[in-house]
């Protein structure tokens, strides 16, 4: 048995002086304490570790960018002990055998807990494994599909699923996949695509809108649905990050969008924080036609902890959005420091800071 004493974040109580007992990887006891002078006390705060329900670890198929080992190591370095990987690897994770192969690779390489999303394709709900495959969720992309089929598939899966349907909500009719388009055109095209998509998406408690990025998108969220926001859509914008290195999907938006989304995030209207970690090689991002995406799983928690230090964000909101809310959305018993939960927590000293140098980063793209 291991014992940790310190000031910990306990759900519905806040910061409490506690003694945490851990056995076989799970919390066996959490007790209020006056601290044992003969036992070392944790220097700083004990917070629930984060769960990132939106990562792209590039394995299989694109391991020159990243694999499950480096991706999960960067997650652990950033205080993230559970991730859900998106299906747009090579091959796409679209059927049971592809799911099992990715699961095999992840079990072999990952140093954190993981879930896997499955891509929505034609006739998915008719497959004999549809109701039994242990996927974290279904994922619907707008690429290479007509708008009619996109919304039909969404309706079909939502009508039969008991798992979340995560949608990359950009309307197929309004997307332009020209890799040479300048950043301003890329942003405008994707702005129209997101808002049009959201206005046509059917309401459902199983619907989850990935990486919300605009004020109008927030206003057009389908009823009963949940959503997430990424640090780069809260902190970066077209004024402070204008180079093609900053090309992501959905794109960076305006300062006004930053402020509106941040306010909704503070209030809990946007319940979940996710990174949309999507690394590429340095050479790819520095090319004349860089692919969309940037790393984030290693920096998501530190960036938002800095927001707490600067008093722009309450610690309670951060803990809920990075640990409790994503676990609850996926129906998982984790994300809290309480008896019976996985012993996944991190030690944080808000009085210390450091610079992240690319040579220190676990993530391959940051090096």
Predicted regions and their residues:
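N-terminal metal-binding scaffold of metallo-dependent hydrolase/deaminase domains
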Residues: 1-35
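Divalent metal-coordination and catalytic microenvironments
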Residues: 25, 54, 75, 79, ...
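Conserved active-site and cofactor/substrate-binding residues in soluble primary-metabolism enzymes
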Residues: 63-66, 70, 94-97, 149-152, ...
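Divalent-metal coordination cores built from histidine and acidic residues
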Residues: 73-172
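Histidine/acidic residue-rich metal-binding segments in metalloenzymes
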Residues: 127-273
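His/Asp/Glu-enriched, well-ordered alpha-helical/loop segment
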Residues: 182-205, 267, 272-273, 277-350
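Single conserved hydrophobic/aromatic residue that forms the stacking wall/gate
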Residues: 357-367
């Amino acid at each position: 048995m291991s014992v940790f004493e310190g000031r910990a974040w306990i759900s519905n109580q806040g910061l409490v002086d506690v003694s945490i007992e851990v056995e076989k990887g799970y919390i066996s006891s959490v007790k209020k304490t006056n601290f044992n002078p003969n036992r070392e006390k944790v220097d700083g705060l004990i917070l629930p570790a984060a769960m990132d329900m939106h990562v792209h670890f590039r394995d299989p198929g694109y391991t020159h960018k990243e694999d499950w080992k480096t991706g999960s190591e960067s997650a652990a370095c950033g205080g993230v002990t559970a991730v859900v990987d998106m299906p747009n690897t090579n091959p796409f994770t679209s059927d049971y055998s592809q799911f099992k192969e990715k699961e095999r690779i992840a079990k072999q390489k990952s140093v954190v807990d993981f879930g896997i999303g499955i891509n929505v394709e034609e006739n998915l709900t008719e497959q004999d494994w549809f109701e039994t495959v242990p996927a974290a969720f279904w994922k619907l992309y707008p690429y290479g599909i007509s708008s009619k089929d996109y919304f039909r598939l969404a309706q079909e899966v939502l009508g039969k699923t008991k798992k979340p349907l995560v949608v990359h909500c950009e309307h197929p009719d309004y997307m332009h996949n020209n890799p040479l388009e300048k950043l301003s055109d890329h942003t405008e095209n994707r702005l129209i695509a997101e808002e049009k998509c959201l206005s046509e998406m059917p309401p459902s408690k199983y619907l989850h809108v990935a990486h919300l990025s605009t004020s109008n998108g927030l206003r057009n969220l389908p009823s009963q649905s949940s959503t997430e926001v990424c640090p780069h859509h809260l902190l970066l914008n077209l004024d402070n990050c204008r180079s093609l290195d900053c090309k992501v999907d959905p794109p960076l938006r305006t300062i006004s969008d930053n402020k509106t989304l941040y306010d909704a995030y503070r209030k809990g209207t946007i319940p979940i924080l996710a990174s949309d970690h999507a690394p590429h090689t340095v050479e790819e991002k520095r090319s004349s036609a860089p692919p969309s995406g940037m790393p984030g799983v290693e920096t998501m928690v530190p960036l938002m902890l800095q927001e707490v230090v600067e008093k722009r964000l309450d610690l309670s909101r951060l803990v809920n959005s990075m640990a409790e809310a994503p676990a609850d959305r996926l129906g998982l018993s984790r994300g809290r420091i309480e008896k019976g939960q996985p012993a996944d927590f991190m030690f944080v000293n808000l009085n210390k800071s450091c610079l992240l140098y690319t040579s220190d980063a676990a993530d391959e793209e940051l090096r």
